[in-house]
A protein has these predicted regions:
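Short, structured beta/alpha segment
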Residues: 1-57, 61, 233
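Conserved C-terminal structural/oligomerization subdomain of aldehyde/semialdehyde dehydrogenase
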Residues: 2-6, 188, 324, 328-443
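Short, well-ordered beta-strand elements within core beta-sheets of diverse protein domains
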Residues: 3-10, 24-31, 78, 114, ...
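Short acidic active-site motifs
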Residues: 14, 177-178, 366
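Long amphipathic alpha-helix in the N-terminal Rossmann-like dinucleotide-binding domain
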Residues: 42-53, 67-92
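Rossmann-like NAD(P) dinucleotide-binding subdomain of oxidoreductase/dehydrogenase enzymes
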Residues: 94-234, 361
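ALDH superfamily catalytic-core signature
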Residues: 198-341, 404
Length: 443
C-alpha cells in the first residue's frame, strides 16, 4: 500500500488537443490498407513479446496482482488479444456484394474514445486500442488513473511499432473531468467504456447529445450452477478458486454458487476446504496465491459487504478483517456464505472481492430462475455430467457467455453482456466490427 509514483492528470484542454491530433491523423490513417495495418500489428506483437516481463511487473506494481498471475493472465492478454485481432483482420472483408447486387463497405468509424479500468488494465486496453487501430480508426485512451504504468508502457510499444503520429493518444485523467469531456466531445464518434454500471450510465448520458456510438462492458454477479451429476470434487473446488481469482476483482467472476439440494452438504464441505487451503501472500512472490485488494477504498467496500453478509446469512469460512500475518496491505480473508437467499444484498450486489455466496436450488427450473434473477448478464457457469442438460440450461441463461464444466475464455472469441452488464462485444471479429461503419452502395 505504499506510493509507487505520481502522474499528472489531464483536463478538458488536454482532451481537446488529443482529439484534434486523432482527428487530423484519421485523414490519412483511415486510408491505409489492411496489409499496412497488419504489418503494424505484427510489429506490435513482436515488441509485446520482447517487453512482456516489463508489462507483467508493471501490472503487479500498480494493482497488486501476484506476479505469476500477471504473467499467465494479465500481461498474456496483451499477446492473446492481439493475435486474435490479427486473425480477425486477416479474415475480414472490407467489401462484400449482396445477393441483391448492392455492395457493403466496412469503413473505420473515426476518432474513438476509450476508457479502461484498473482490475485488468492491459486486457481491457488491448480489447479497445487494437481493434480501433486495426479497423483504421484513431483513438484517445484514458486508462484508470490508478494504473498508469502499464498504459504508459503500452503507449511506448505502439510508438515503437510504427503507428503514425496522432493515431493513438494516451491521456491520464479522472472520470469526471477527462472521461466526461471525452464522452461529450463532438469530434469523438465512438466511446468504448469498461467499468462500473454506474459510470457506464454516465458515459452513455454524456454521449447522448452528440449521438455517438457507445459500447459498454460493465458489472456482473455471475451464477455458477452445480448439478449433482457433475464431478463434485473437481468442479466445486475449481469453481471456488475461479471466484477468488484476481482476488475476486473480475466483473465476470462466478460469485453466486447455485447448488442442487441433493448434493448441498457435500458441496459445502468441498467449498470450505478449498477456501481454507487458498493461500494469501505478497504479489511479488511466485505462486498461485491471492494478492491484496487494489486499494483501501476497495478493501473498505468488501469489508462492508462482508458485514452485510454476516447480518443476512450464515458464514461458512473467512469473515471480517485481514488474514493473520498480513496486517500491512489490503488483504482480505477468502470468504464464503452459505444458506443464502437470492434476494439478499450479498446475492444481488457486485462485491468485487474474494467473497462467494452459496444458494441451494431444488430443480433445474428453479436453478435457471435464480440464475437469471439479477440485473446483470455478463457471464454464467454450469457444472454437469449431462451434455444435453448443459446445452438445455445454457440456452436459457441470460448471459453473454456460459462456461461449461470449467471451459475457459479463448482469445478471439466475443466477450460482452446482456442486460445491465453492457452492450457490444469485445474480441475477435465482432470486437473489430464495433469500430467500423457500414456503407451500402446501390448500383
Amino acid at each position: 500500500n505504499s506510493q509507487g509514483g505520481t502522474i499528472i492528470l489531464g483536463n478538458k484542454a488536454d482532451v481537446d488537443n488529443a482529439v484534434a491530433a486523432a482527428k487530423e491523423a484519421f485523414k490519412t490513417y483511415a486510408k491505409t490498407t489492411k496489409e499496412d495495418r497488419l504489418k503494424l500489428l505484427s510489429n506490435l506483437l513482436k515488441i509485446t513479446k520482447e517487453r512482456f516481463e516489463e508489462l507483467a511487473q508493471a501490472i503487479t506494481t500498480e494493482m497488486g496482482a501476484p506476479i505469476t498471475m500477471s504473467r499467465e493472465a494479465q500481461a498474456d492478454a496483451g499477446i492473446g488479444h492481439l493475435e486474435g485481432f490479427i486473425d480477425a483482420l486477416k479474415n475480414s472483408k472490407d467489401r462484400e456484394v449482396l445477393s441483391s447486387g448492392d455492395t457493403i463497405l466496412r469503413e473505420p468509424i473515426g476518432v474513438c474514445g476509450l476508457i479502461t479500468p484498473w482490475n485488468w488494465p492491459i486486457n481491457q486496453i488491448a480489447l479497445k486500442v487494437i481493434p480501433a487501430l486495426a479497423a483504421g480508426s484513431t483513438c484517445v485512451l484514458k486508462p484508470s488513473e490508478y494504473t498508469p504504468l502499464s498504459a504508459t508502457l503500452y503507449a511506448e510499444m505502439l510508438h515503437d511499432a510504427g503507428f503514425p503520429k496522432g493515431a493513438f493518444n494516451l491521456l491520464h485523467g479522472d472520470g469526471p473531468t477527462v472521461g466526461s469531456a471525452m464522452s461529450r466531445h463532438p469530434d469523438i464518434q465512438m466511446m468504448s467504456f469498461t467499468g462500473s454500471t454506474r459510470a457506464g450510465t454516465s458515459v452513455t448520458k454524456d454521449s447522448a447529445d452528440t449521438v455517438k456510438r457507445v459500447t459498454l462492458e460493465l458489472g456482473g454477479k455471475s451464477p455458477n450452477l452445480i448439478f449433482a451429476d457433475c464431478d463434485l470434487e473437481e468442479r466445486v473446488s475449481g469453481s471456488v478458486l475461479e471466484c477468488f481469482y484476481n482476488s475476486g476483482q473480475s466483473c465476470d467472476a462466478p460469485t453466486r454458487l447455485l447448488v442442487e439440494r441433493s448434493c448441498y452438504e457435500e458441496v459445502l464441505k468441498i467449498a470450505k476446504r478449498t477456501a481454507e487451503n487458498q493461500a494469501v501472500d505478497e504479489p511479488t512472490k511466485e505462486g498461485e496465491h491471492l494478492g491484496p485488494l487494489f486499494d483501501k477504498i476497495q478493501f473498505d467496500r468488501v469489508q462492508n459487504m462482508i458485514k452485510v453478509g454476516l447480518d443476512e446469512a450464515d458464514l461458512l469460512v473467512g469473515g471480517l478483517g485481514k488474514p493473520e500475518g498480513f496486517e500491512d496491505g489490503w488483504y482480505v480473508k477468502p470468504t464464503i456464505f452459505k444458506d443464502v437467499s437470492n434476494d439478499m444484498r450479498i446475492a444481488q450486489e457486485e462485491i468485487f472481492g474474494p467473497v462467494l455466496v452459496i444458494i441451494p436450488f431444488k430443480n433445474e427450473k428453479e436453478a435457471i430462475e435464480i440464475a437469471n434473477d439479477t440485473p446483470y448478464g455478463l457471464a454464467a457457469y454450469l457444472q454437469t455430467g449431462d451434455s444435453e442438460k448443459a446445452e438445455r440450461v445454457a440456452s436459457q441463461l441470460r448471459a453473454g457467455a456460459v462456461h461449461i464444466n470449467g471451459g475457459g475464455f479463448n482469445y478471439g472469441s466475443p466477450f460482452g453482456g446482456y442486460k445491465q452488464s453492457g452492450n457490444g462485444r469485445e474480441g475477435g471479429t465482432l470486437g473489430l466490427e464495433d469500430f467500423q461503419e457500414i456503407k451500402t452502395l446501390h448500383f
